[in-house]
Design a protein with these regions (language model features):
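Mature N-terminal, pre-catalytic/accessory segment of carbohydrate-active enzymes
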Residues: 1-25, 29-32, 36-37
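Alpha-amylase-like alpha-glycosidases and glucanotransferases acting on alpha-linked glucans and related
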Residues: 2, 10, 16, 54-193, ...
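Short alpha-helical segments and helix-capping/turn motifs at coil-helix boundaries
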Residues: 25-32, 194-202, 277-278, 424-428
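Catalytic domains of carbohydrate-active enzymes, especially glycoside hydrolases
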Residues: 26-50, 286-287
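Surface-exposed amphipathic alpha-helices with a cationic face
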Residues: 35, 196-204, 329, 353-354
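Outer-envelope exported proteins of Gram-negative bacteria
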Residues: 45, 209-211, 215, 289, ...
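Conserved, well-ordered alpha-helix/loop/beta-strand core segments that scaffold catalytic motifs
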Residues: 185-218
């Protein structure tokens, strides 16, 4: 595998006059900056529609795209919106942070205007899109329309028992009753995928690959669980039997209770993992490389009986292991996958990583707190891995510098052989690029030397996450030249 490098930046973090980044011209500008910097990978966060808490890892659908990412300027150019209709809205006043409440209150109203105008024109491409994507689109659009009619509560709380349990007659009744709204949600997906195709073609045309992110679990509040309850460990009334999380560890005495429903792997195996393979196939239409979050759950997953207040009483249960990936390769051919294998790795996870041959992840921020034996130190790497300075779940490098123990910071400086005049973030970036890892990825916050105010997410907290936005003025030619030189010196520049 050729040595390569790239940046991690959520699309939501791009500059935009409409409060949140989109797949419009600023996304193309950022791709141009990657090219100028000698990078060949743009890693992004999941792009599904987000729910309460705004986490891209809790989505209403594993297939649908986030309506927030649709570029409104493009809709104006198509005559579906006027500039005035877009600019008269309050998208938030802070260019450094996304105001999700304001986005939520305005974005769908504006998209509804676009939809009403769209209905007057040619529907041919839309009809074709609906037909090609009906396997997931019908369920998703109806789910969102019914959800909206019930004040956006999850399907497990819908007051109409018949539609909650997907009674056939009730499904038909709601499809008729909410027809226009159902079609609106289909239109939104049509525009997302139309724009995504154009965005991806532009990025790929520059020789840059999109490294996308797939959460392993689906949200309880999703079209997936509502439409396919048999795939999950659910009771007949829709309540989960057990939910996902992580056991207590050094960082948390009570563990992490994520609350996602767990897969019924016996059922999935009996159906030749068809749902999963369709999901992975759909991801490869969006991305060139797919990172699978919490990969270890394919070896064994943590099961917490429902309901629970914390993760203390869970147990490890065997996952589908290598059989799943062998069958996947038979069904889909070779798919480029990065396995998120962070945390404590048990022998079954190590074995699965070796069997699949997927590159795992190494994070430099984890490397300097336990001396020479730490597996995240670069001299321990093999070529077949992706090295990061940090991820969306960690503090920025400069934020880490402020809070780390002095002895850990001193060890990092000494190990990385940082001269006194080298800024700490650049020392870590240099070491990542010079490491033997095939791929090096750096979050934009670390390239810009930003502190904890630019951290993307603090796990197990609600509010104030996923809001950081990039200042476009920071992407200078001087910075691009510096990064390109670093790529060249470390053998990561494409010929």
């Amino acid at each position: 595998m050729a040595r390569s490098a790239g940046f991690l930046l959520s699309i939501t973090s791009l500059p935009s006059p409409y409060g949140i980044g989109t797949i419009g011209k600023e996304a193309r500008k950022f791709a141009d900056f990657l090219k100028k910097s000698g990078q060949t990978i743009w890693q992004i966060l999941p792009v599904g529609p987000t729910s309460y808490g705004d986490s891209p890892y809790q989505s209403f659908s594993t297939y649908a795209g986030n309506p927030y990412l649709i570029d409104l300027d493009t809709l104006c150019e198509e005559g579906l919106l006027t500039k005035e209709e877009v600019m008269s809205r309050d998208w938030g006043s802070d260019d450094a942070e996304v105001d999700y409440e304001k986005i939520y209150n305005n974005r769908f109203e504006v998209l509804k205007i676009a939809y009403d105008n769209f209905k007057k024109g040619d529907q041919k491409a839309f009809t074709s899109f609906k037909r090609k994507n009906s396997s997931w689109l019908k369920n998703y659009a109806l789910y969102m329309a019914v959800k909206k009619s019930f004040d956006m509560v999850s399907w497990t709380e819908w007051p109409d028992e018949e539609i909650k349990m997907r009674d056939e007659a009730a499904v038909k009744r709601y499809e008729r009753k909410l027809k226009d709204d159902v079609d609106f949600w289909k239109f939104v997906q049509f525009k997302f995928y139309e724009q995504w195709e154009s965005f991806r073609a532009y990025v790929n045309g520059l020789g840059i690959k999109i490294l996308g992110d797939m959460p392993i679990y689906v949200a309880m509040d999703s079209a997936d669980t509502w439409a396919n309850p048999e795939l999950f460990q659910l009771y007949d009334d829709g309540d989960p039997i057990a939910v996902a999380g992580c056991p207590p560890d050094y960082f948390s005495a009570t563990g992490q209770l994520w609350g996602n429903p767990l897969y019924d792997w016996d059922y999935l195996e009996a159906t030749d993992y068809e749902w999963w393979f369709e999901r992975i196939k759909a991801a490869s239409k969006l991305y060139d490389i797919t990172r699978i979050d919490h990969f270890r759950a394919f070896a064994s997953y943590y099961s917490i009986p429902y309901p629970a207040e914390n993760a203390i009483n869970g147990e490890w249960v065997e996952g589908p292991r290598i059989k799943f990936f062998n069958m996947m390769e038979e069904a889909l051919g070779k798919i480029d996958i990065v396995a998120e294998d962070l945390g404590t790795l048990t022998p079954d996870v190590t074995e699965l990583m070796e069997q699949t041959g997927y590159p795992g992840m190494k994070v430099l921020e984890f490397a300097f707190d336990s001396g020479e034996e730490n597996d995240y130190l670069p001299h321990k790497y093999t070529e077949n891995c992706v090295v990061y300075t940090g991820t969306h779940d960690n503090d920025t490098v400069m934020g880490w510098l402020e809070t780390a123990k002095p002895e850990d910071v001193n060890y990092a400086r000494s190990y990385c052989q940082m001269p006194d005049d080298e800024p700490f973030n650049w020392g870590l970036i240099r070491v990542a690029y010079e490491s033997k890892a095939d791929t090096a990825i750096v979050p934009m916050q670390d390239i810009l030397g930003l502190g904890k105010e630019a951290r993307m997410n603090i796990p197990s907290t609600l509010g104030g996450n996923w809001v950081w936005r990039l200042d476009g003025a920071a992407l200078t030619d001087e910075l691009a030249d510096k990064l390109k030189t670093m790529s060249e010196k470390s053998g990561r520049l494409e010929d």
